[in-house]
Amino acid sequence: MLFRSGTYYSELRKTHGHEVPYGVHVWCVGNEVDGPWNIGQKRAEEYGWDAAEAAKAMRRIDPKIELVAVGSSGTQLDTYLEWDRVVLERVYDSCDYISLHRYMGMPAIDELSTYDRRDTGDYLELASRLERNIQDVIAACDYVKGRKHSDKTMYISLDEYNAVDIGPEADDFLKECDPWEVGPCTRRTGISMRTTLLFGLGMLAILRHTDRIRIACQSILINGDGMVMCSPDEDAWVNGSWHIFRLCSLYGRGKVLETVQESDRYDTATCKDVAALDSVCIYHEDTKELDIFAVNKTEEDMEFTVQAAGFQQLQALEHLTVTAEHLSDRNSAKEKNKITTVSTQDITCGAEQIQCILKPYSWNVLRVKERIE
């Protein structure tokens, strides 16, 4: 696809009306080849060798491309992390990223025996498993970096992530259809506010590790557990995750500040001493804006105070809240805004301090700005 003409695929591209190559810059050297669900599954040693040789050939065609090696497909696999170590030993000098996939709440990955899906606190803690997954892969990368005495840093391509709403609240999993039907129906129940919160907590975990996560792709975009839902006989509508993703895209660009947080703690069905609050702060040097992402994981209002050291004069801009009346609420073609974003002006700013109230089970963005006199 990188040639203008003269190869089978470049000529095929031209027959479809595209004279110029698509200019794809990032290439994945395989996908989930460690997974037993795949035909052509490989051992780490086999894949590492093949990937390194493929990378060599691809860079001879275009030295400027970036390459993603296949990382372990899930923490549930016996080869988890050992796969990453072995592959990285082989491809460390020839690839730029290692992939990571995570679907929070998918039974095959987050084993039902290790958490209680009916317990909201337990369910929301699945975001901490994503964060641990990220930390594990970073550790594997840095271990190989040390082994090789390398100055190169391996980055992560989180090229599949989402929160999956499968369980008692989403019994209408798949509509019955002909197994050979082209474009069959997929689940269109949408995701609940509870799963929206889980997705939002996962986004904060990603933001905290953007020093190593250079690529992140939400999966899937349309239907299933996607951000956008549609049907041949109904209007399109958005899931709660769309609101989260939109606000992260708008206000999650900048410098992630190191934060220390204190909050009440609680126990869940299987977890002890869980923080009731999660938060991330982003500073935008160009606009002097400080955006605080905060999640109240409890059923009560939360008094939220930020000690913003070094920010002497602050001006409140907006408090954005993704919320719903009930955790089980979900958007649909008939009720498109049961989960929505609400804007209020309830932030109080003082010298190095920001205060507001976080609603129960809510995902928030507090937007403030340095006042320049």
Predicted regions and their residues:
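Acidic-and-aromatic substrate-binding clefts and catalytic sites of carbohydrate-active enzymes
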Residues: 6-8, 35-37, 45, 72-82, ...
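C-terminal beta-sandwich/jelly-roll accessory domains of carbohydrate-active enzymes
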Residues: 271-276, 295-373
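Conserved, mostly hydrophobic/aromatic
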Residues: 27, 98, 137, 160, ...
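Aromatic- and acid-rich polysaccharide-binding/catalytic face
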Residues: 20-39, 71, 84-130, 154-155, ...
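Alpha-helical scaffolding segments of alpha/beta enzyme cores, especially the outer helices
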Residues: 46-60, 82-86, 132-139, 198-205, ...
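Aromatic/acidic polysaccharide-binding cleft in carbohydrate-active enzymes
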Residues: 151-279, 287
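Aromatic-lined carbohydrate-recognition surfaces of secreted/lumenal glycan-active proteins
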Residues: 11-17, 57-79, 130-163, 214-221
